[in-house]
Amino acid sequence: MPELPEVETVRRGLADRLVDFQIGQVEVCRERAIASPGGSALFIKMLCGMHVGSWLRRGKYLMASLHHEIAQSSADSEPDPDGGWWGVHLRMTGQFQWHEAISSPCPHTRVRIWNKKNEELRFVDTRSFGQMWWVPPGNAPETIITGLQKLGPEPFSSAFNSSYLSKRLKGSKRPIKSALLDQSIVAGAGNIYTDESLFAARIRPHTPSGQLKKVELERLCNCLTEVLRVSIGAGGTTFSDFRDLEGINGNYGGQAWVYRRGGQACRICSTPIRRESLCGRGTHWCPNCQR
């Protein structure tokens, strides 16, 4: 599943490509891709004619403001979305493609959106778990996209710090990796970046969360945000399905310290990286560097 860096990469691509984008036509190729009340019929009706404003990311969710007229943003904000919100979750294999010329859709195309110039934004999803929502104007996105209600703080926010983690993890016996994967504790982290950040922080993924000291939690917070920052700069990670809006792979995978490097020598100490299942997730770690 695309994690925070991959979703942020997509957000930036959409923000760049969809400047002054007015939706002229929408085609839903698979009904289950639309998760909001009213299904595809209402989704199509309410998006057609709308101007797409700012793209936001919350955890692994994407949201675009919709406007009846072109949104004239100030330095600090843009007008309220009088057309509501357009929400997206890529899930396992969802990806956006940009097509300037007319082309036939592949079998896994789920939603097609054209502007007035007949340029197409295409949503392709092999596993068909990706979802879209239309949120009516005047409603907070989380009232319709209910998964937003459960999200913890963003890793880059001031709310995510060692004091916060210490309170949330106090007395917990579950492995720290499992805690980091919990979206109600920190939004956006997934299997790749939990492995990478725990390695950077020199913490074993099996360590009971509640046993970590304040200094270790502070180091973990710093390492997680730094790993995410580096991956965003590399355009995310591609091991299978992820591509950005232009079809380009993410480049972080080649820089990974432990993820998908089971059996290979640790880049720091040359100890073979271990791969095992922890809490049902493939987990990579160095038994020498992480104690």
UniProtKB/Swiss-Prot annotation:
<keyword id="KW-0456">Lyase</keyword>
<dbReference type="InterPro" id="IPR012319">
    <property type="entry name" value="FPG_cat"/>
</dbReference>
<dbReference type="InterPro" id="IPR035937">
    <property type="entry name" value="MutM-like_N-ter"/>
</dbReference>
<dbReference type="GO" id="GO:0140078">
    <property type="term" value="F:class I DNA-(apurinic or apyrimidinic site) endonuclease activity"/>
</dbReference>
<dbReference type="GO" id="GO:0034039">
    <property type="term" value="F:8-oxo-7,8-dihydroguanine DNA N-glycosylase activity"/>
</dbReference>
<comment type="subunit">
    <text>Monomer.</text>
</comment>
<dbReference type="Pfam" id="PF01149">
    <property type="entry name" value="Fapy_DNA_glyco"/>
</dbReference>
<dbReference type="InterPro" id="IPR015887">
    <property type="entry name" value="DNA_glyclase_Znf_dom_DNA_BS"/>
</dbReference>
<keyword id="KW-0863">Zinc-finger</keyword>
<dbReference type="InterPro" id="IPR020629">
    <property type="entry name" value="Formamido-pyr_DNA_Glyclase"/>
</dbReference>
<dbReference type="GO" id="GO:0008270">
    <property type="term" value="F:zinc ion binding"/>
</dbReference>
<feature type="active site" description="Proton donor; for delta-elimination activity">
    <location>
        <position position="281"/>
    </location>
</feature>
<dbReference type="Pfam" id="PF06827">
    <property type="entry name" value="zf-FPG_IleRS"/>
</dbReference>
<keyword id="KW-0511">Multifunctional enzyme</keyword>
<comment type="similarity">
    <text>Belongs to the FPG family.</text>
</comment>
<feature type="binding site">
    <location>
        <position position="108"/>
    </location>
    <ligand>
        <name>DNA</name>
    </ligand>
</feature>
<keyword id="KW-0326">Glycosidase</keyword>
<keyword id="KW-0234">DNA repair</keyword>
<keyword id="KW-0238">DNA-binding</keyword>
<comment type="function">
    <text>Involved in base excision repair of DNA damaged by oxidation or by mutagenic agents. Acts as a DNA glycosylase that recognizes and removes damaged bases. Has a preference for oxidized purines, such as 7,8-dihydro-8-oxoguanine (8-oxoG). Has AP (apurinic/apyrimidinic) lyase activity and introduces nicks in the DNA strand. Cleaves the DNA backbone by beta-delta elimination to generate a single-strand break at the site of the removed base with both 3'- and 5'-phosphates.</text>
</comment>
<dbReference type="Pfam" id="PF06831">
    <property type="entry name" value="H2TH"/>
</dbReference>
<feature type="zinc finger region" description="FPG-type">
    <location>
        <begin position="257"/>
        <end position="291"/>
    </location>
</feature>
<keyword id="KW-0479">Metal-binding</keyword>
<dbReference type="InterPro" id="IPR010979">
    <property type="entry name" value="Ribosomal_uS13-like_H2TH"/>
</dbReference>
<feature type="active site" description="Proton donor; for beta-elimination activity">
    <location>
        <position position="60"/>
    </location>
</feature>
<dbReference type="InterPro" id="IPR010663">
    <property type="entry name" value="Znf_FPG/IleRS"/>
</dbReference>
<dbReference type="GO" id="GO:0003684">
    <property type="term" value="F:damaged DNA binding"/>
</dbReference>
<keyword id="KW-0227">DNA damage</keyword>
<feature type="active site" description="Proton donor">
    <location>
        <position position="3"/>
    </location>
</feature>
<keyword id="KW-0862">Zinc</keyword>
<protein>
    <recommendedName>
        <fullName>Formamidopyrimidine-DNA glycosylase</fullName>
        <ecNumber>3.2.2.23</ecNumber>
        <ecNumber>4.2.99.18</ecNumber>
    </recommendedName>
</protein>
<dbReference type="GO" id="GO:0006284">
    <property type="term" value="P:base-excision repair"/>
</dbReference>
<feature type="binding site">
    <location>
        <position position="127"/>
    </location>
    <ligand>
        <name>DNA</name>
    </ligand>
</feature>
<feature type="active site" description="Schiff-base intermediate with DNA">
    <location>
        <position position="2"/>
    </location>
</feature>
<dbReference type="InterPro" id="IPR015886">
    <property type="entry name" value="DNA_glyclase/AP_lyase_DNA-bd"/>
</dbReference>
<dbReference type="InterPro" id="IPR000214">
    <property type="entry name" value="Znf_DNA_glyclase/AP_lyase"/>
</dbReference>
<keyword id="KW-0378">Hydrolase</keyword>
